[in-house]
Amino acid sequence: TRVGVAGTGSYGAGLSRALNAAGLTVVEVARQDRQARRRRGKSDPLDAHQAAVAVLAGTDTAIPKSGDGAVESMRILLAERRSAAKARAQVMNQIHALLITAPELVRQAFRALSGQRLVNTLARTRPGSEASADPAVVARQTLRRFAVRQLTMQAEIDLIEQQLDLLVRQVNPTLLSLSGVGPVTAATLLVAAGDNPDRLGSRASFAALAGVAPIPASSGQRTRHRLSRGGNRHANAALHRIVLLRIRHREPRTMAYFERRRAEQLTDRDIMRCLKRHVANEVYAALLNPAADNPAGRELRAHRQAIGIPISVLAASLGVPYQRLRRLEIGTRADPELERRATIALDAISPPQTA
C-alpha cells in the first residue's frame, strides 16, 4: 500500500515516520501546479484527493527520507552547529566593531592582537568594578563578555563535531576515507541522502539532489547547459569544499583532470562544476556501500537465526519496518536503540539453556 504525504521534511515528518513504522510505503507528494490549483480551487479535501490521484497515477514517485536513524541525529546536530557558528561569527564582528569605537586607551591595549589571540586575551582581562560609569571600564567589561561568549560557542562547536565524527564512523566510515571529506562534510552529505540513501535510484538523481546536474538550455544548433540553482545547497557547498581541498592539496587525479580540461579551453569555473559532478559520483557510490563497522548487527542476526525467528516477525513485534531491521543486521546501518530493543526481545523468547 502506498500513501502520499506532503511536506515529509517538515509538518508531515511525524506522519511519514508513523506510516513507515506501520509497514506502508510513503511517497512524497509534490506541490500542485499553480495554474491547476487556481482552476480547481484550494481546500484540504481537494488537496487530499489530488495527492491520492498523483500517487495512483504514478506522477509522484519520490521516496522521502525515513528520518528514523543516526542520520536524523546528524541533521539535528548540524542545525545546532550552524546556529553556533553564526553566533560565533556575530560576536567576533561585535568585538571588532566595539574596538573601533572604544576609548583610545582600550584600542591601544589590543591593537596588536587579532583573531583567537585577541579573544583569549580579552577573556583573561580584569576590567574593574561593575559599578563604574567610565566608558573605558564598561568597554573592557563588554569586550570580556563578548570573548567569553565566543569561547563558549567554539566549545559547543567542538563538542558537536566530536559527536558528528562518532556518528559518521558508525554509519559510513567509507565517506571519511575519500580525499577532502571530514566529519562535518560527510555528515552534511549523509543528511542530504537520508537514513535510506537507496531511495536515490541513480548517480544522476543524487547529482540533481545536490544541485550539480547541469540543466539543458540548448536552442537551434547551439548546444549548451546552464547551472542548476536548485537542489540541497548544503550538499552543494559540501561538494564545493571537497573540490577546493583537493585542488589546494594538489590531489593527483584532480590536478590531472584540471589541466586536461584547461587545455580544452574550459574556464576554471566550468572545470570546478565538472569536478563537483565527479565528486558527487564518488559520494553516491560511498553512500550505497558504507562498509559500516557494526559487528553488533551481525551478532544480532546470528542470535535471531539461532532461535529460528524470521526477521519479518521480529520487525513486526518491534513495530519497525523490515528494511530498517535488515540494514542493522547486515551492517549498513548503526541503530543502537533498535539493537537494544531487538536484543531484549530475542532474550525474552530464547529457550532457557540446560546444564
Which residues fall in each region the model found?
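Glycine-rich, often acidic, oxyanion-interacting loops/wings at catalytic, nucleic-acid
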Residues: L77-T174
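The alpha-helix within a helix-turn-helix
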Residues: L176, A207, R304, A315
